[in-house]
From Swiss-Prot:
Example GO molecular function: orotidine-5'-phosphate decarboxylase activity
Keyword match Lyase: yes
Function (record text): Catalyzes the decarboxylation of orotidine 5'-monophosphate (OMP) to uridine 5'-monophosphate (UMP).
Name the UniProt record assigns to this protein: Orotidine 5'-phosphate decarboxylase
Biochemical pathway: Pyrimidine metabolism; UMP biosynthesis via de novo pathway; UMP from orotate: step 2/2
GO aspect biological process, one term: 'de novo' UMP biosynthetic process
Keywords: Decarboxylase, Lyase, Pyrimidine biosynthesis
UniProt enzyme class: lyase
GO cellular component, one term: cytosol
Higher taxonomy: Bacteria, Bacillati, Bacillota, Bacilli, Lactobacillales
Length: 233
């Protein structure tokens, strides 16, 4: 498994913004970064090549969700980019997730997105017509992802402990929606935890965006979050 360091969400719209942000970090500080839809759709595969040229690891967060054959073919293309981690939507079903695994191969970590951290209990039941608790829905998706041969899931840290109980010991739980203790603004995230809390309940990786990218001193903010994350072994 890759080193369990905090993953920085590069939620920017273009390469210029990314390079400006990365200038805050010493060149010897090798990072694990998340490239999402906005940046990837803006810059294309060239952003992957640029980030890899700097020695950083990449979580390509595109959340694929389509028919199995399309997902298989798409993953085979992404595998050639040299990414370290990527994902699909668990709602696509076991066959789609199996196809994603086949297309990606055995190198990069493949995760399934369960319920977004912006989704509340009420939204899930009303909009998705899922009459379960959030934790039961997330754990159901986690079990299906494991059945499909995926490496883990993306889920709120609030469900981390239950995921660990209902899957095998090597099954990864990556948690977004991480906020330092001093952060009061939750933005659009509804199910959040601090880095230390997430580690305690079983998170293997955390994704942190605005608390680092919007900080006055991004490198210092990153170091503080990394220190808190590593406080628990």
């Amino acid at each position: 498994m890759l080193e369990k360091c905090p993953i920085i969400a590069l939620d920017f719209s273009d390469l210029a913004s990314v390079t400006t942000f990365l200038e805050h970090f010493p060149k010897e500080e090798l990072l694990f970064v998340k490239i999402g839809m906005e940046l990837y759709y803006s810059e294309g595969p060239s952003i992957i090549r640029y980030i890899k040229s700097l020695g950083h690891r990449i979580f390509l967060d595109l959340k694929l969700h389509d028919i199995p054959n399309t997902v298989r073919s798409s993953m085979s293309v992404l595998a050639k980019l040299g990414i370290d981690m990527t994902n699909v939507h668990a709602a696509g079903g076991v066959e789609m997730m199996k196809a994603a695994r086949e297309g990606l191969g055995k190198g990069p970590i493949l995760l399934a997105v369960t319920q977004l951290t912006s989704t509340s209990q009420e939204q899930m039941q009303v909009d998705q017509h899922i009459n379960l608790s959030v934790v039961d829905s997330v754990c159901h998706y986690a079990q299906k992802a494991q059945e499909a041969g995926l490496d883990g899931v993306v889920a709120s840290a609030q469900e981390g402990m239950q995921i660990k109980k209902q899957t095998n010991e090597h099954f990864i739980c990556l948690t977004p929606g991480i906020r330092p203790p001093q952060t009061n603004q939750l933005d659009d995230q509804k199910r959040t935890m601090t880095p230390e809390q997430a580690r305690i309940v079983g998170a293997d990786y955390i994704v942190v965006g605005r608390p680092i990218t919007k900080a006055e001193n991004p490198y210092q903010a990153y170091l503080e979050i990394k220190e808190e994350w590593n406080r628990i072994k």
